[in-house]
Every structure is written in C-alpha cells, then in structure tokens.
Amino acid sequence: YQGDYQFSHEIEHYVGKELFTSSMVLKTSGFNFYRSLNRELYEFDPEKSFDDSNSTLYRCVDYLQKKNHTTVITYNYDTNLEYLLKKRGVRYTVVYDDNSFSDQEAQVDIYHVHGLLPYDRYTERKYLDSLVFTEEEYYYLYNNPYSWNIAKQLHDFKFNVCVFIGISLT
C-alpha cells in the first residue's frame, strides 16, 4: 500500500463486516480496494478447492453438467464457477452488464447481477464499472425497474424453481 498501512489494514478488516461499503472507502488514498478484493476472492489452493468432491461448488457443477441449458444467477463477483465449468468442458456464457448476452448454444448461462471481477483482469474498467458495492449503487440498481439485473431476477423467481446457496438474505 502507498498510504498509511495501519489505516489500510483497518479498512480492509472492516469492509467485509459491513452490509454496505461506503463510497468513501473505495476512494481512500493509498488503499487499492479492488486489488484487496481480488486477493480475498482468489487466494486459495485451487487443487484442494476445485477437486474436492464434497464442496458445494463441485456438486453444483455436477448438477449443471447433467442439465441442458440451465441459468445460474449469482451475487458473487468471482469466476470460480466458470473456472470449474471450463475445466470440466461445459460450455457456458457470462452476463455481467448491458453489453454481455447469453448464448443459446451454451449449456449454462451465468448472470453476475452485482458485477464480475475476474482473477486476471480486475483492473479493466468494464469489470470495475459492473460492480455493485455501495449503498448508493444498490439503491440505484434496485430502484431501476428496467435494468437487466432486476428483470432477470424477477423473471426467474416467478417462473422457475430457485435454489439459494451461500446467501444469508439478512
């Protein structure tokens, strides 16, 4: 970090404990929020995480492999699901903003309704612009009835059986 290390460490510690991230945290001098988030999302042992047949992610991919054209709506920013699908040879598409679209030939369509932060491209503006972090961003998103994010969720919640995994809803 370029700024005060102790201050950066305190912010890093508390950001994960708050329901909403303040836009002030994202603009704090010397603290690279996106680099820290990327590190938190992807610092793990891939072999242990992706090859563990008892993990929730592994079992989800087992299920998705057996289905023909399934939709996944995720509130996660990471691409771990995509990595495991690719590793298993499952064709998928990713939708994370107004300029990305599903593919009829894909077996799985993955909708990142709060944005996407790929492991190796976390500094690219198109991904950073897709992320929903702050209270203001959540307010704007959920009060915009014409956004694809809301329309997709409402459609699937109304017409499909939905399973929530790893979400507290509190």
Predicted regions and their residues:
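Conserved catalytic-core helix/loop/strand module for nucleotide-ribose chemistry
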Residues: Y1-T170
